[in-house]
Amino acid sequence: MAERANLVFHNKVIGGTAIKRLISRLIDHFGMAYTSHILDQVKTLGFRQATDTSISLGIDDLLTIPSKGWLVQDAEQQSLILEQHHHYGNVHAVEKLRQSIEIWYATSEYFRQEMNPNFRMTDPFNPVHIMSFSGARGNASQVHQLVGMRGLMSDPQGQMIDLPIQSNLREGLSLTEYIISCYGARKGVVDTAVRTSDAGYLTRRLVEVVQHIVVRRTDCGTIQGISVNTQNGMMPERIWIQTLIGRVLADDIYRGSRCIAVRNQDIGIGLINRFKTLQTQPISIRTPFTCRNTSWICRLCYGQSPTHGHLVELGEAVGIIAGQSIGEPGTQLTLRTFHTGGVFTGGTAEQVRAPYNGKIQFNEDLVHPTRTRHGHPAFLCYIDLYVTIESGDIIHNVTIPPKSFLLVQNNQYVKSEQVIAEIRAGTYTFNLKEKVRKHVYSDLEGEMHWSTDVYHASEFRYSNVHILPKTSHLWILSGKSYRSGSVSFSIRKDQDQMNIHYLSTGERDFCNLLASKKKVRHKLFRFNPSDKKERRISDYSIFNQIISIDHCHFTHPTIFHDTTDLLAKRRRNRLIIPFQFQSIQERDKELMLASSISIEIPINGIFRRNSILAYFDDPQYRTQSSGITKYRTIGINSIFKKEDFLIEYQGVKEFKTKYQIKVDQFFFIPEEVHILPESSSIMVRNNSIVEVDTLITLNIRSRVRGLVRLEKKKKKIELKIFSGDIYFPGEMDKISRHSAVLIPPRTVKKNSKEKKMKNWIYVQWITITKKKYFVLVRPVILYEIADRINLVKLFPQDMFQERDNLELKVINYILSGNGKSIRGISDTSIQLVRTCLVLNWDQDKKFSSIENAHASFVEISIKGLVRYFLRIDLVKSHISYIRKRNNPPGSRFILDNESDRTTINPFFSIDSREKIQQSLSKNHGTIRMLLNRNEKCRSLIILSSSNCFQIRSFNHGKYYNGIKEGINQIQRDAMIPIKNSLGPLGIAPQVAHFDFYRLITHNQISIIKNGQLDKLKETFQVFQYYFLDENERIYKPDLCSNIILNPFYLNWHFLHHNYCEKTFTIMSLGQFICENVCIVQTKNAPHLKSGQILTVQMDSVGIRSANPYLATPGATVHGHYGEILSEGDILVTFIYEKSRSGDITQGLPKVEQVLEVRSIDSISMNLEKRVDTWNGRITKILGIPWGFLIGAELTIAQSRISLVNKIQKVYRSQGVHIHNRHIEIIVRQITSKVLVSEDGMSNVFLPGELIGLLRAERAGRSLEEAICYRVLLLGITKTSLNTQSFISEASFQETARVLSKAALRGRIDWLKGLKENVVLGGMIPVGTGFKRIMNRSKQRQYNKMTSETKKKNLFEGEMRDILFHHREFFFFVSKNLCDTSQQSSI
């Protein structure tokens, strides 16, 4: 009883660590047997108390935190604001991701902190609270998921899923939350994150590497060791104790002259306490790294056994234990993810808050403006920054540490608890960094644009990857893309309007004809005065066609249909061509049909002398078949042959000119041509004669009778059929020199009979072989060309009454060269002759210096009559677009909402407010032509009403740009000139530099009609538009200017000089505007959507919808400027650093990377400078001769320690403690191989051979020569395949290869390891079988050699002192290197 009264009673909570210490002390004092009896009593006591308490767990015991509702709501509100800023283009994707992580992580951590106080207040005896917070079962993370919120989850790659699980397991998960939560769960829907199989395979590889490591000696005799500094705050105490306990000292420990511990003494708790209290010198310990043999290990280098607490016994299989100790926790931790479910773990930066209200002041010279990782503006301070907060008479000083962000401005008033600074988290928490790629995908379909200030140049010439040099916006302009393999949109111009249902509804025949390169078929309809529509599909013979898509001038003409008459009126220095719409009955029969007249205007709108203004393809010069064109001057020759066959003919001689203009007639020799693939089956032979409708291939039949000629060209076969008759002449010499000649209609004498030839023929000599030849007589078509086409046929006679400097000339020319073959495409007709309208002007004194004529378009609508004019001036016009303000009700030109309207005139404009509203709200969009690198594939993009929107709120008060309205209440035309060409809105605008302005005046305009009716005077108001030139300057005209129009006589007068220039802050065409930007200085200012400005009018702005994406420097942009992207395509890729996740499912791959020696982190940019600095300091301190040798030795040791620390960090983050000696055994094996160099030990080892490090050193000592080798880091897999036992290698991987190579080399396996003995069924050399196999004589011989080595290696002892007694210098150098590298990177 007296003894029990002296016992001390501790009324405290005992945790797992305290129980471990108690058990360790019990074993030390009482031994194993008595300790196990004590622990059995503790276990019985615990079970009895749990039974008496009767703890049970029900679903009602899971109590949710009451404040969860408003906390989640607040986090959602913050996320919504963040999403809006991202939508506006203020923050980019990575900043949004980081801030979203911190918002939800902070919310989740608040729940975790509130759990324990909530249980204590509401239900202190709650079973969940008792079991989890006492440590009996469960932990805070698991309870947090039960009653708090699951929070953010990780995917299998360790990336955070940007959708937090707001529910907990008590409330239940939705389907989406359940699937997301299963990413990290065991046996879930998505089980890819579970690394159980990987952990098992890792264990197998580790055991393969170290299965032969057995404790076979007591002491290896090494004098080396690893130095461990005393406890000085740099290393946590717990890790320092774990590093030392169970080790053996490599050297005596002194304090002054007093010896505290001796060499080969094992370190226990008592000795560690003495080291802590006495603060001795650095402690040198023996580790597996210092053992002198790699095939086994001694007791002193291994240390104490972790199970018994004393030195390890001989025959202990420490290699197997080491492999299992590292691999098995990975499996167990992977299984443990069933409870936590792969919850994302991260950290937030520390914040500094203001203590009270006041004005903040700091030195602005010590900070630099920057951007936080959340996208907020801030100041970065590089040194300690002293901040003062003044509040009345109180001055509070705050010191901001370096590399922190200051979130307020100087002299700003701050409120209490307001965040004023953000301190970057400590290096120990965030030192595990990894580079992550974040892809941003396009949210809509459209074309890509960069900001104007972005320099974009790809790294490679044809690469579509661009690196951004600075922060800028990427824009995706909305629009839908239509692509076709060979479509040439010849009648579509950039900015033209068309029906958006055109390509998707019943107009497939048009696209198919274009795709097959057949003749273009236009659907036409005209309007009669009675406003009745007529539709018809015109004949092939009326329309222009596509001859070759390689000639841009002929494939992109503006085509006017047969609803237009081409009329012209010439005046002084001006040519005005009106396009007047008339009915068929009123059409002048003498005028040539203008449907095939194509106006051809340069892109810049400038004509030079002798430029082609228009061209006309006469239908009579068209043919449907392929053939050869011939045109020559005519001469007469005669050749007499034998009596039986006489041919008299009129021969011709070739007249070689590039452009044959003055040809009266030319000849066309037809032939049938087929281009067939090389693999096609041809059913006719070469030089054979076929009849009409003969089967040539499986699906092609001949159309004519004639001779077949086959020719192979570039993996294709060209098949020609020459129509005509065949003659076999008697003598070859008389006719061969006259082959390929044309014969006119003549009388032929044959056998005393005369036969008259009605048509021209073409004689062609065909030679099959030297003895086989014949003459082919082919039919010829003769075309006569008129001398000149009278301009009166093209234009009315009254147009040429006045003389002018401007002239129009009509010139004919043949499209193909002389003797050139013309090939038709399928059923497409071929144009042989083209008539051109050439523009020229007299070179008199006044206009001798004028070389250019400027073209412009004019449109006038008067009471429903719309007239279009192409105007050509020698002096550039300032006004070229005139419209009538309003139209009578009911008058209309073309119904725009007709779905069958497929081709819209490029000059067409909409005439009323109703029509533009229909076009914007229903079916109409705008074409934008796109140029692709692949010329064979063209595409167009259609902007529909869903992609364009109109803002009409400029009706009263001030306008944008500060322009005030002079007269209110004026009804304006609502037309948006989408076809406006003021700015480079398209890649290939047809009229890019035309002046395209509205007329500006408030005065009246008089129009005098001098027609068949009586004279009528009418006045109307002109639109209020402002002039905008290409330099984005606004010109406001004189309000007193008048314009008098006489549209019938075209006696126009333009006032060009009465402009008063005034500059405003304007919105230019093509400018990008982000959402929520105010552009109108009014009270009810509209908040625009983001987009690009298409049109600017006095009362409205047309904006094309677009999405902005903010990109930072170094981001990778995928695609070219103007490229069409589909929805979901990768737009940009960010590369940023993030903290590595603490989840073991992501930690195990890192362990595997270290053990397999794969590169993890990128190499530092200034690595060479750091190595040079290191070598310089080592040489300076230790001396020149031995500097690099000692540096190499330290590098090997330091690399081993670094590998151990990296593996330990992963396991310690999960709360798993593995003794360093287990990891050191593994690391020793993967760092113990060297590669023999080319110039070293050539007489012993082969160059490139892998040998052990100690074996190489022994060979060098025995040979007494320099050792040249390179130390390698081999992965555990390669190490397992490079052992001394080929049986062990063959049982691991590549069995056939290993065994065959061993047989060829004659390798001998000494069966020293465990695995090879197990395979062969022998006794394994560990445990009880160890003493029988061990060779005692070998042991005595080795001990003798060890004692001799100790006497001779005095120099090694001195070097050991240099290496390990200067450990503090090594830490000092490392710290300086780290600091210098951080400063250089900053």
Curated annotation (Swiss-Prot):
Indicate where this protein resides in the cell: Plastid, Chloroplast
Q: Which GO terms describe its molecular function?
A: DNA binding; DNA-directed RNA polymerase activity; zinc ion binding
The UniProt entry, under SUPFAM superfamilies, shows: beta and beta-prime subunits of DNA dependent RNA-polymerase (SSF64484)
The EC class name is: transferase
NCBIfam families reported in the protein's UniProt record: rpoC2_cyan
This molecule's function is given as: DNA-dependent RNA polymerase catalyzes the transcription of DNA into RNA using the four ribonucleoside triphosphates as substrates.
Q: What is this protein called?
A: DNA-directed RNA polymerase subunit beta''
Q: Which organism is it from?
A: Glycine max (Soybean)
Its gene name is rpoC2
